[in-house]
Amino acid sequence: MVNRFDVFLVNLDAAPSGDAKNTRPGVVVSPDEMNRNVDHVIIAPLASTKARYPTRVAVEFLNGERMVILDQIRTVDKNRLVKKVGEIGESSREDVLDRLGEMFAK
């Protein structure tokens, strides 16, 4: 089962130039109803970069600060999810949802 806010290693090979490539951690941002009923999920890459942009959210993960890169969200087939490596914490979840709301609400 895949849940919103799970972090998976995601096979991102064949991504367009300039986007995150290879196998990278990604946060599932699609709602659980979608995750249960379709063969795709929406993910946002998780990176160790310290670059701060309005479309990125800092989270604590694997004993360090990571950035959820919401300006590179993408839909991927579930068979691209290689392995679950954790999930982001409660306070970070609200930050991600708030930022997504700002990006798409108006």
Model regions: which residues?
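Conserved functional hotspots at enzyme active or ligand-binding sites that engage polyanionic ligands
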Residues: 1-106
